[in-house]
Amino acid sequence: MTEKLQPLRGMKDLLPDDYKVHDYIINKARDVGVLYGYKQMSIPILEYTKVFNRSMGESSDVISKEIYSFLDKSNESVALRPEFTAGIIRSFISNGLQHKLPLKFFSTGPVFRYDRPQAGRQRQFHQLNYEYIGAKGAITDAETLKLAVDILKALEIEQDTILELNSLGCSESRSVYQQKLVEYLNDFKDQLSEESKIRLTKNPMRILDSKSEIDQKIIAAAPILSEYYTDESKEYFEELIKYLDILGVKYVINPRLVRGLDYYCHTAFEFTTKKLGSQSTILAGGRYDGLAKIMGNNDDVPAIGFAAGIERIALMREYNISEVKPVFVLPIGENNICYALEIVDKLRLQNISTIIDPVGKIAKRIQRVLNENAKFIIFIGDEEQANNSLKLKDLEKKEEYIVDFAKVLELLKKY
């Protein structure tokens, strides 16, 4: 018996009902982005692995454990994108867009991470991504957060999320804090998880993201970053809070929320929910003024962005999405097919969704139409063809009309 082929573990087909929801989410998010001046762009799914090594760091979980990376036929190390930001900044640099700042980009599509599949977490999943490049200051961060709120409102899930907010401060703040954090953690280094022992020497702030229960108990009493803010960092965060209050954005300050990469600074945020269990983050982002230079640009470029998981948004609520119901055209006999094709073509030229079903017994074809929850059937038999007319059946009203094409158009366009 021939093997029944299956998709790879953690990679799901998007069937029409799934895609309908995805498309709805993307369109709603895109429309809100347009109101804020964002323009859509697309980047390759495949990049050189070094694009992500530079941006995310080789000690990160994504690079060390989750990235789909391999040698291509030219012996180049390439990777399926695990996120959008690195590719967007690579595109910004390689296309020489430095003289067109500021830029607002919206992107969407699949990303890939070799992770343990579970509800809300697959190995191929889809994201909405927004990047605001070339604009600095707390007002930019506030506007970006308001954009995120408005997207979640448009998707009718904002009321089920909490905005968790923190400031990572400037590089000076983080440098002093990291030193204090290492001093504290060194007293517990024998008790840390194996991963955190490695991070202690490579990137200690990543330990604050650890999911290990042992690490969490140690972290609970660790120094807090806000205790080491410079005056500049304090002023920046206070200004952001002022703007958010003016905009009516509700938030909770989470002093443990960090980003473990050097190019992140100041604002970091996550929108979380209690509706999805352990996969609680719906949308997350932050300011990353240092990334462009790390990736080869001559200078630092201020930037802020965020990404949201489409599959997780889809799990948050059930969307009742209205669909265009096509008109079905059923030629009764083979000799009616040519006339039926002409009618179908005319209807489509009038932007009326039309499906012709010419094969099989008429009773079975009618049943197929009923299974599609259609509203109208057009029957074409010898009599209709001879009289240049059509038999239109309204399945909801259970009424039939024998009319010419112009009258059919008039009736169909009412619905």
UniProtKB/Swiss-Prot annotation:
InterPro entries: aa-tRNA-synth_II (IPR006195), aa-tRNA-synth_II/BPL/LPL (IPR045864), Anticodon-bd (IPR004154), Anticodon-bd_dom_sf (IPR036621), His-tRNA-ligase (IPR015807), HisRS-like_core (IPR041715), HisRS/HisZ (IPR004516), HisRS_anticodon (IPR033656). Homodimer. CDD domains: HisRS-like_core, HisRS_anticodon. One of its GO terms (molecular function) is histidine-tRNA ligase activity. GO terms for cellular component: cytoplasm. Its EC number is 6.1.1.21. Its main location: cytoplasm. It is found in: Cytoplasm. The keyword Nucleotide-binding applies. Keywords: Aminoacyl-tRNA synthetase, ATP-binding, Cytoplasm, Ligase, Nucleotide-binding, Protein biosynthesis. It comes from the Bacteria. The lineage of its organism: Bacteria, Pseudomonadati, Pseudomonadota, Alphaproteobacteria, Rickettsiales. It catalyses: tRNA(His) + L-histidine + ATP = L-histidyl-tRNA(His) + AMP + diphosphate + H(+). It is an enzyme of class 6 (ligase). Pfam families: HGTP_anticodon (PF03129), tRNA-synt_His (PF13393). Belongs to the class-II aminoacyl-tRNA synthetase family. This is Histidine--tRNA ligase. One of its GO terms (biological process) is histidyl-tRNA aminoacylation.
